[in-house]
């Protein structure tokens, strides 16, 4: 891979972070629950409001990075430490997205549902760009891969288990912090879990060839 192509891929990855963060902001603005992987940070941001959602996402991502190190130990590749600054960038993008959302009304249930669906599409678009960039995984996906490698289990199955675990942790935190009330986990969480993968596959099919041409400087064979 040439230096120029590598730079292009990292630029695309940064762009993917922006859209993924914007997708999170849309779903958060809908107040019907966020994606499973963001649900823990979402509940914590609702309880401890002195820190923004973006900041809690940075903290959660760093926890997942530490988890990777503990799982992989000597097999953890130093290049993966790039996840740390990229997590901070993702958090900043999320807070910027929340600022944008402050100008968009979502005061009725239909509008909130629209926010969720738009968020899922935008999030899926961002994830697709990250997949096509193919330079570094986000901390959530990297943690799942580490767990899959250690347990010798299928990545897809581990991803499902991880999403369920995130929701369970968020649910426990919600019950503890909000007097046995479920906060931040709603139909939007379920919709995100079910539909995001479908959206990612759609965008992969549409964008893979044209973006490969841009990244590689020639039409893929």
Q: Over which residues does each language-model region extend?
A:
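Core subunits and conserved enzymes of cellular information-processing
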Residues: 1-221
